Structures are given as structure tokens and as C-alpha cells.
Amino acid sequence: MAAPYKSDRRGLIWICIFLGSLCDIRAEQIRYSVPEELERGSVVGNLAADLGLEPGKLAERGVRIVSRGKTQLFALNPRSGSLVTAGRVDREGLCDRSPKCTANLEILLEDKVRILAIEVEIIDVNDNAPSFGAQQREIKVAESENPGTRFPLPEAFDLDIGVNALQGYQLSSNDHFSLDVQSGPDGIKYPELVLENALDREEEAVHHLVLTAFDGGDPVRSGTATIQVTLVDTNDNAPVFTQPEYHISVKENLPVGTRLLTIKATDPDEGVNGEVTYSFRNVREKISQLFQLNSLTGDITVLGELDYEDSGFYDVDVEAHDGPGLRARSKVLVTVLDVNDNAPEVTVTSLTSSIQEASSPGTVIALFNVHDSDSGENGLVTCSIPDNLPFRLEKTYGNYHRLLIHRTLDREEVSDYNITITATDQGTPPLSTETYISLQVVDINDNPPTFTHASYSAYIPENNPRGASILSITAQDPDSGENAQVIYSLSEDTIQGAPMSSYVSINSNTGVLYALRSFDYEQFQDLKLLVTARDSGTPPLSSNVSLSLSVLDQNDNTPEILYPTIPTDGSTGVELTPRSADPGYLVTKVVAVDKDSGQNAWLSYRLLKASEPGLFSVGLHTGEVRTARALLDRDALKQSLVVTVQDHGQPPLSATVTLTIAVSDNIPDILADLVNINAPIDQEDSDITLYLVVAVAAVSCVFLAFVIVLLIHRLRRWHSTRLLQAAGNGLSSLPASHFVGVDGVHAFLQTYSHEVSLTADSGKSHLIFPQPNYADTLISQESCGKSDPLLVSQDLLEIKGDSSLQQAPPNTDWRFSQAQRPGTSGSQNGDETGTWPNNQFDTEMLQAMILASASEAADGSSTLGGGAGTMGLSARYGPQFTLQHVPDYRQNVYIPGSNATLTNAAGKRDGKAPAGGNGNKKKSGKKEKK
């Protein structure tokens, strides 16, 4: 029981609200009255005063008249605030003969989106005089008619109403006829001619009368028609209609030519007096345009289109007359039935074409009116919009509807809407009209730029050109206009103390990252950048993304040979190998590194050239130089090898080193043999030199030939003189040469002199090795006294006569153990015995002696040399040298492809003296001290 009671209370509440809204609507209607036929601009009423507004505020408040496409009868005067006539107001044209004529219009207050209804009653004035359809009318009357017979007269029409309408008729005075006016049920007055006295055709065949119609206006208006009464022979029967009134209902829009009905009248007379014809009687022009009457058959057909919206009812007067002229009257009442032939009309009265996406729900977008000219259910209209749109419709006053925002708009999802408003009536079949409203959603900056990737990785090869494009970074902003204009920038970081902006830059508009300098992989391998994308909205929004820039290594570094180090003076090192070495004996090891990485740092070693092919081999990956076969007696003492070190880059880079290997089992043999070794001549260099000499000679001989011919005689004499001077002066001193160490390694340096004794007829030379002068001596004078020369000539031995100058055979200290030899052989047992020196100082002394002898044999242009940190010797000599231990190249040397470093096998030297080295312990100690 409680539920129905609660439901009834809700119903009562809604009924009260509805009745209250009706009261409000009625309270907002304004009524005016105005007479018709006023001049244009005539004041109808003070609208501003009735609205409670100042006259000048109508335009500001957006007050205007809205209509549904009909002719505007009224207008607003924005200055006075009055409602005035916009043109001629014709009551008869608007309302025909309706007793009350009103014009309805709506006033729109745009600032409040409110509709105000105004009803203007148009008061009739006497502006139309009564008129007859025909100015003349002939009535045929039988002369035998009895007094009292009535004859219908033509009716007059007056478009005015009320007092101004037709009030009565008057007939001109005569002796035979009088006027009687009858009033029908519809209030229309019908004049009739009444025969008062008998007629005599032979006395007067035609009677002329004047019928006057007048209205009740002030002043009175009237109209006249001439009535001609023609007397005929007797026709005592008039036609008679089968029905006093004919009723028919037809649907509008019947096809033209459709027969509506057939009227029928009969006349009992015979002959011409009984022949009946039909015609319309006193019809308006509009009816004559819609209907057609067949005068012989009485068929009424549709002549024009029937439109219920123009008129739903037609009253047509018809008459039938026989041959002599007797007439009968009847009515045809045509009711036009409405069909759903008019689609609803939608008139947009207020529209917002653009709206911000942040607008709140309930915001009014448009106000429109819906009208259907049909009636009944055919005129009931419902409006709808698609369900998927964020809008809704709301009905307001009368047939007005509002389009509102229902959900929050998002321009990034939909930037514009083409809203279809469908107005559908309830007819059968229903008709509909679609109206389109375009709405542009205005963007606000509510979206930050979004990068296409969560992070970026870019790669650039080193040695890139400055300004090279690295990567294009793209960020999308779904907003529009300035809100979508993205500006790119880099974070202000530093790299190795330098600002990031000195390394890379980014195009603020395109997001293309450029390199501002050439990168070096060996300097750094990667950069971490932070890219910011900022839009141009207010306030601006931004996003960041990380960028990892990796520098790719290129093969831009040539392999660097650590051992043997290439001397700066052009000499080559000397490696010592016993002639009794077995195949596979480790002679030395070429050690190289490459600053590049990866494949660019993979090194391979190859034997490029050898003075004795097949004698030595080089490890492809280790660089170890080993004997490929046993050494033979015919193998030369001095072997020259050219080893190339090549990386695996593209293109590959390489470096070469020249090794000189001295092959002997005994030190004296080395000294004796090196004296007679001539430096090999590089055939390729010789060929190049020959080509250069030939080219220079070919160019110069043309210019110098004549000079040479003139001077050849003097040159011969000068040459003879020089020979004589040389014979007289004795031995000439030659420039000193010196042994130097390279790459920061101080090797011992020995200075000596070459003296050549030449006479004009001598065929031999004497090599003299006088006592060397030391700046940093191997054995200082303070500690060891004066040393004997390594080699002396026979003449010098005779002069000095000192047996101490004779060379003693080497003792057992002059043995190299396998641990003291260059290369990785230090891993072998250091106690190996033999004829090689077994301490560092003896090795150095031996190398000095070997190199001195080799230099003399090469005529002062040695091809043997010692690189810094090697066991080799240099053939360049100077006045001073610094004595240090020859560094062991195996210490802290990186071998590509290996995790091992070369060990120092000379540790025994630091711990204790090797066996058999007693004669040299003091010297070694001196050297360490220095």
C-alpha cells in the first residue's frame, strides 16, 4: 500500500510542476492589436517597455524576431524599442473571412536563450467595397409567370467582416419587380427578384434593373450590377436538383482530372425547355482554378492540386437551368482530408559554430524550432540525434528545442562534429527532415608531446665529418595549432669537462641530431643524452626521452709494434741465435697492439721478406719468430727478416718491422764474421734510386753537358791534387758514430773512431779501434780504470807492444741462457749452459762489439741496429751514451688474444748473480749503481 501512495504523490508533484510551467509560459505572452492597412513603420506596441528593458538595450540583449520562413509582417525598431509594421498588413489576405484574425510571432532573447510569444490581433477596416462576380446578369422570365414568383439574383461579396461586411441590397425602382433579401444559415444574404405585377412580353420584352449592394462601414461602400430581365415564352417547369446539398470528402493531392462527383437536375418540360445545363454560380477565382464542372453531364473534376494546408473545406454553389432559362440552385461541400505529405521543417534560430573542448556539460550549442504543416498525428514531430554523440536534445517552449553538451568533449578524439538532427512526424508513413549542424571543437593545450619511442639508441662511426646527421627524433603532439608545435632541445650536461652542446646539437624544429665534432672511439665509446620536446602552448607542456649515442670503432689506428721498437735513426735490431738451434727454436717475438677494438684490433703476423726463405717462420697469431729448419753452415751469419703486422679491419692496416738475426755459436766467430759482412742492398730501393737518378740526369744533362765538357779537365787536375795530399797527410779521421737507445730506454753508447790509412798506391786499409771515450761509460775510469780497445790493427799492436791489448778468449760468463734471450723463451730453464753470456751486462758488451764489427764491414752504413728495449744494437755512434740495463720487453706487455704478460726472466739477476759470471760481477754492480 505504501508504494502506490508514494507513486501518486510523485504524480501530483509532476502535475503541479507542469501546471506551473504553463502559467509561466502564458505569463510570457504579449498581445497587441493593430488595424490593417497601416503604413510601413507604424508602431504596433512598445516592446522594450513590456520587456522591462531600455530601448537601446534590445540589440545588446540579442532581442530579435524569429519566424518559420513566412513573410515578416512586423519588425523591431532598435532605437525606440517598438514593434512596428514591416509592410502592408492585409487582414483579408491573412485570414480571409475569419471573424478573428491574429498574427503570432516569437521574440528570441539570445542572452537568456528564451522565447517570448507575441500575438497581434489585426482589426478589420472598411477597405473593401461589395462587388459582384459579373457586372451584368441576364434573367429570362416567362411572360406567363404569376406575380409572387421569385428569381434569384447575383450575390455580392465583401471581404471585410463584421459591420464592414455586406449589409444589404437595393433595387432600382420599377413597376414589375421588387427585391427580397433572404439570409441563409451561414449568415449570407441572398437577393431575390420578386415579380409584383403580370408581365406582357409584347408590351415590354426587356426590363433593365440596377442591383446595389452596400456594407455598414463608415463611410459606407457599395457595388452595383445590371440586371437584364428578358421575357420569354412560357416555360412553366424549372430544373430540380436531386439533392439540395452534395457532400464529398477527398484526400489532398488528388491527381488532376480525378472526378469528384456528378450533380443531377431534372426538368419535366419537353424540348428545349427540358434541356438542363450546369454551371458554377458566383464562385471565387480560386475555386474555379481547383474544380471544373461539365455543363452537360454535371461531372465535377479536379482541375488543380488540393492542399489541406491551404484550405480544408470548399463550399461550391452550382445551378442548373433549362433552355428557356429557368434555374435551380444547389451546393457542393468538398472536405479535403489531410494526408502526411509535409515533412517537418527545422529552423535554427541560434547556433554556436565552435566551442572549447573543456566546456562543461549542459552548455547550449544551438536553439531550433520544429514545425509540421500537417494536422493531427501527421503534425506531431519528435527530434533525435545519433546516440554515439556527446550531445543531447532538450525541448523548451512550444516547438523549440535546445542542443546541449552531454559529455565532456575531447578534440584529440574528435576535432569537429557534423551533428544530424532528425525531425520525424507520426504520420503513416512517417516523414522526416535532417538538419546538419557543424561544430568545431577548439583545442586547448592538454596534451604534452609524446615521443615515438620510449628511448632512442643511435650509432655513429668515429671520424665522422662535422655536421653529420646522427638521428631524427620525432615527438607527436595530438593538440593543434601552436599547441602542437614541438620544439626540441638537449639537456645541459658535460662530457669530460666540456659542455654537451660542443659535441652534438639538435634542430629545434625537425628533431634531427647533428654531430658538432669528429668523434674518437678511443676517447669515449658512448654518450647519454636527454632530449626534451616542448610544445608552444600556454602553458607549455614537455616530455623527455633518453638517447644513447654509441661511437662505432673504425679501423683508423695502425698496429703499433712494441717489440722490437723501431729506432728513430733508421737502424735495425740484432737478435742472436745459435747455429745449433733446432727447428722450432724461439728466436724472438714480435709484440704489437692496436688501439682499435674488436675485429679492427685482431692482429696477424706474417713474414713479408727474408734473406733466406724457409729458414724462419712467424706465428700467425703469436708473432713468435722461430727457426723453420736446422741452421746449416752455408747459412749466412746475418739474416734479415721483414715482419708485417696486419689487423682485420676494412681496409686492413699494417706495420712492418725489420729484424736482423746474427747466427753463431761463438762470440769470436761473430766478431770475425761480422767484419766481412756487407750490408745487403735492397734491390727495390736500388731500382727506385736508379730511376730517380736517370730521370734527374735526363733533365739535367741538356743544361749541364756543355759545363761538364769545360770543367772535366780541371776536375781531373783537382782530383790528382787531392790524392797527393791524402798520401802526405796520412790517415784521415772519420766522423764518430754512436749507439743510441730509443723509446725512452737508455742503452749504452760507445764512441769510437774509424781511421783509414790510404796512399796513392796502397790497396789495403787498416781499421783502428782506439780507446773509446765515454760520457757515461760502460766501465767508468773511476771504478775500473782504462779499458782496452775492442779491436786494433796489427800496426798499432806493434807500436804499443802491450800484451794486455791482446784479446783473451771469452770465459763461461759469455753465455746467454734461454731465459736471457729475447722473446718468450724466458720461460725456459735459465741454467742452460753454452757459449752464450748469461748476464745482462755481458750481453750488452757483446752486442756493442758485434755492432762495431758489423759497422766496419758495412763501410760505416750499418743495417744492424737495436731498438729500444731490445737485445739488438744500433750502428749510429756519438760521443756520449747512458748505460742502463737493456729493458726486458716482456714486462707489462699486452699480447693481443692472450690474457698473459711476458715475465721477467732476469729476476735471477736481481736476486743473485748467475753462475760463471764472477769476472763481470763488479762491472754489473757498477752499471746498476750508475
Swiss-Prot record:
Residues 28-132, 133-241, 242-346, 347-451, 452-561, 569-682 form the Cadherin domain. Residues 713-930 are cytoplasmic. Glycans are attached at N418, N544. Residues 28-691 are extracellular. GO terms for molecular function: calcium ion binding. Residues 803-839, 900-930 are annotated as: Disordered. It is a single-pass type I membrane protein. It is found in: Cell membrane. It comes from the Eukaryota. The keyword Transmembrane helix applies. SUPFAM superfamilies: Cadherin-like (SSF49313). One of its GO terms (cellular component) is plasma membrane. GO terms for biological process: homophilic cell adhesion via plasma membrane adhesion molecules. Residues 920-930 have a biased composition (Basic residues). PROSITE patterns: CADHERIN_1, CADHERIN_2. Keywords: Calcium, Cell adhesion, Cell membrane, Glycoprotein, Membrane, Repeat, Signal, Transmembrane, Transmembrane helix. Residues 1-27 form the signal peptide. Potential calcium-dependent cell-adhesion protein. May be involved in the establishment and maintenance of specific neuronal connections in the brain. This is Protocadherin gamma-A4. The gene is Pcdhga4.
